[in-house]
C-alpha cells in the first residue's frame, strides 16, 4: 500500500503541451526510477554474469531480439508456393549469424570489417545449402525448370580439329628424278613436269589398244601430183604429233609411278612405326588398368 500511495517524480523535461496530454504522453513517456531492491539485484546479476563469462569460453550470441528462424513457419500451398530471391549477406546480418564460426571466435576485427576473401568460401557453402528444398518431398525449382541433359555435361567450347585435305599432306620422300627424264616428260616451252603434284584421270590411266598400221596402197608415179604430196606431209606431221604426245604421256606416267613407289614405301614404314608405338601404348594402358582398374 505504501508503494501504491507513493507519488512518482515527473520527468523534468516533460512539459504538457496545450494541444493534448495523451499525445504528449505517447511522444514523451515517463521514465520511472528503479526501486533500490531491483537495482541492487540487477547489479548483483550483472557481476555474476561477468564472472561466468571470464571463467567460461565465449559463446556467440545473437543480438537479434525478434523470433528466430526456426520458430518461423512458412505457409505452404501446393499451387502458390514459390521460392523468392534472398540476399544471403542481408539474411545473415538480420539473424546475427556470422559468416563462419572460426572468424567469430578468432578474428580481432568487427563483423562489418572482415575481409571479403575470408568470407567467400563460407558464403558459397551457405548459398549451396540455401538452394536445397525446404521440405524433403518437394524438389527444388532449379531441378523442375532446367533438367540436366547428357550433352550439357560436356564443355561448350571443345577444340574440334578441322578436317585436313589429303592433297595438302606432304610425305617426306627421298626422291630426286633425273633431269633428263624430266625434260623428256615436259612439254617444250612450258612448266617442268612435277611428279609430286601431277595427277592423271582414270581415262588416261586405262590401257590403250594397239593401233594397227593401215595397208599400203600402191600409187603409180604418174598420179603423185602436188595434192598427193601435200596430203602425205600433213598425215606424217599428224602421226608424229600423236607419237610425241603418246610418248610424253608414257614418260610422265613412268616418272609418276616411280615417285608413288617411293612414297608408298615411306608410308608403309610410317605405318609400321605407328603400329609399334600403338602396341606400346596398349601395353602401358593394360598395365595401368590391371593395377588401378578400368578407366
UniProtKB/Swiss-Prot annotation:
Molecular function, one GO term:
sequence-specific double-stranded DNA binding
Cite any additional comment in the entry: Mice deficient for all three PAR bZIP proteins (DBP, HLF and TEF) display a dramatically shortened life span and are highly susceptible to generalized spontaneous and audiogenic epilepsies (due for example to the noise of a vacuum cleaner) that are frequently lethal. The down-regulation of pyridoxal kinase (Pdxk) expression in these mice may participate in this seizure phenotype.
Instruction: Name the keywords, alphabetized.
Output: Biological rhythms, DNA-binding, Nucleus, Transcription, Transcription regulation
Cellular component (GO) terms are: nucleoplasm; RNA polymerase II transcription regulator complex
Residues of the region (Disordered) are 36-76, 92-149
Organism the protein comes from: Mus musculus
Positions of region (Basic motif): 227-247
Q: What is this protein called?
A: Hepatic leukemia factor
Amino acid at each position: 500500500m505504501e508503494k501504491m500511495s507513493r507519488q512518482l517524480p515527473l520527468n523534468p523535461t516533460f512539459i504538457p503541451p496545450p494541444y493534448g496530454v495523451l499525445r504528449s504522453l505517447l511522444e514523451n513517456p515517463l521514465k520511472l526510477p528503479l526501486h533500490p531492491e531491483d537495482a541492487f539485484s540487477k547489479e548483483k546479476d550483472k557481476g555474476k554474469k561477468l564472472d561466468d563469462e571470464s571463467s567460461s569460453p565465449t559463446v556467440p550470441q545473437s543480438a537479434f531480439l525478434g523470433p528466430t528462424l526456426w520458430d518461423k513457419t512458412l505457409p505452404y500451398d501446393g499451387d502458390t508456393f514459390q521460392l523468392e530471391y534472398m540476399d544471403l549477406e542481408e539474411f545473415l546480418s538480420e539473424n546475427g549469424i556470422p559468416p563462419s564460426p572460426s572468424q567469430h571466435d578468432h578474428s580481432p576485427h568487427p563483423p562489418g570489417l572482415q575481409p571479403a576473401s575470408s568470407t567467400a568460401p563460407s558464403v558459397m557453402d551457405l548459398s549451396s545449402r540455401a538452394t536445397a528444398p525446404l521440405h524433403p518431398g518437394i524438389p527444388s525449382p532449379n531441378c523442375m525448370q532446367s533438367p540436366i541433359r547428357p550433352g550439357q555435361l560436356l564443355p561448350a567450347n571443345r577444340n574440334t580439329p578441322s578436317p585436313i585435305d589429303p592433297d595438302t599432306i606432304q610425305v617426306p620422300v627421298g626422291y630426286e628424278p633425273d633431269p633428263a627424264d624430266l625434260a623428256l616428260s615436259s612439254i617444250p616451252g612450258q612448266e617442268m613436269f612435277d611428279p609430286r603434284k601431277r595427277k592423271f584421270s582414270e581415262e588416261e590411266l586405262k590401257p590403250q589398244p594397239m593401233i594397227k598400221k593401215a595397208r599400203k596402197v600402191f600409187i603409180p608415179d604418174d598420179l603423185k601430183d602436188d595434192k598427193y604430196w601435200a596430203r602425205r606431209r600433213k598425215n606424217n606431221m599428224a602421226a608424229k604429233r600423236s607419237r610425241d604426245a603418246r610418248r610424253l604421256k608414257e614418260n610422265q606416267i613412268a616418272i609418276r609411278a616411280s615417285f608413288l613407289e617411293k612414297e608408298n614405301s615411306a608410308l608403309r614404314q610410317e605405318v609400321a612405326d605407328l603400329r609399334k608405338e600403338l602396341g606400346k601404348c596398349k601395353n602401358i594402358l593394360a598395365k595401368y588398368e590391371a593395377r588401378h582398374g578400368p578407366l
